[in-house]
Amino acid sequence: MNPNQKIITIGSVSLTFAAICFLMQIAILVTTVTLNFKQYECDPPATNQVMPCEPIIIERNITEIVYLTNTTIEREICPKLVEYRNWSKPQCKITGFAPFSKDNSIRLSAGGDIWVTREPYVSCDPGRCYQFALGQGTTLDNKHSNDTIHDRTPHRTLLMNELGVPFHLGTRQVCIAWSSSSCHDGKAWLHVCITGYDKNATASFIYDGRLVDSIGSWSKNILRTQESECVCINGTCTVVMTDGSASGRADTRILFIEEGRIVHISPLSGSAQHVEECSCYPRYPGVRCICRDNWKGSNRPVVDINVKDYSINSSYVCSGLVGDTPRNNDRSSNSYCQNPNNEKGNHGVKGWAFDDGNDVWMGRTISEDSRSGYQTFKVIGGWSTPNSKLQINRQVIVDSDNRSGYSGIFSVEGKSCINRCFYVELIRGRRQETRVWWTSNSIVVFCGTSGTYGTGSWPDGADINLMPI
């Protein structure tokens, strides 16, 4: 074979090998793409709103005669449907409540930068739960914490953290507020934030991080709202707001809000005489609230909200074991479903209850006169029978030697039912503890359980002598 023939033969063989390698590279690439796209294949999106897609990176390092290195294929993940919550599942059947969360904010404040807060609450989006509180514009170990017993200042803001995370310096300040309510409609958060002068406050409605609407004070006397979660059904959120006397006749209105925009306002109707600081929960197809009568009754008002036609009805919890503080002792307390009981009605505390057929679950302080201790129980016939007093399944949440405060309800949707949970505000500092100049709180949270449970007490737990003054 002459030199030219050798060159031609070697060239032909090289070209053949190169062609084979090229074809194998194409085959490997096609196989990789096909397998990955089949693995993540999804149905076409429905007409509902979808979440923005995010790129997914697939990397393969393959060695096969030639080197195919860091092949990157970008594609969109399957669209995730986002729907309004309708809360149509039944309420979970429970035997009592089990411990869920405790943030220990005051104990942590002894050695860390933790916000001074009050009026805490809990609310959940479809994926996780968050704790809220009204901050005082200062941390506890800061001279600005002096005299933070006052409720309404321009420095107060609504704080939001994942449940169980204390309000540290990196906490998000959602809005300016000395009274608030928050809820998630399935697509985004709604925050109702009230601030301003007592005689001319403003309520801002913030939806999906944007200010959408507002309303000014209608009675020029401390416009205020729930201090716990609002409720959204099929895109319509309801929030109870009051403007007027805290110890006399006031003007309560129920606002209906869609994606941050006020679409309707209904006046309070029914037999409730005074309504403040409502603890609301979904009772499909409507919303039900248990509130505070700060004027005439130590029995709690009930507000029923019809989301479809905007109608309102109100009454009082029937249980003769009443829920407010101060109150008469259980032997002499009364409630007959329709009217305030005129028993130590002036003053009170935010609280909660919820119906369970003809019965009622409720929480209240252990003390009849002060915000000390906390207990829960079920009253047989307490929702439907006037002055019913048969109590079962009592639990102590905070023993009577320790302070409590506000409490409220929030709802969590499970696979088959809607569970009811509650939080208790554990107030520390002034007025009772005069060694320090600040007033703040931590929280403890319990949720309904169908299982068994033990006993205990979950107070704030901070030694006031170890705290900054």
From Swiss-Prot:
Keywords: Calcium, Disulfide bond, Glycoprotein, Glycosidase, Host cell membrane, Host membrane, Hydrolase, Membrane, Metal-binding, Signal-anchor, Transmembrane, Transmembrane helix, Virion. N-glycosylated. Inhibited by the neuraminidase inhibitors zanamivir (Relenza) and oseltamivir (Tamiflu). These drugs interfere with the release of progeny virus from infected cells and are effective against all influenza strains. Resistance to neuraminidase inhibitors is quite rare. Glycans are attached at residues 61, 70, 86, 146, 200, 234, 313, 402. GO terms for molecular function: exo-alpha-sialidase activity; metal ion binding. Residues 36-88 are annotated as: Hypervariable stalk region. This is Neuraminidase. It comes from Influenza A virus (strain A/Swine/Kanagawa/2/1978 H1N2). The lineage of its organism: Viruses, Riboviria, Orthornavirae, Negarnaviricota, Polyploviricotina. The gene is NA.
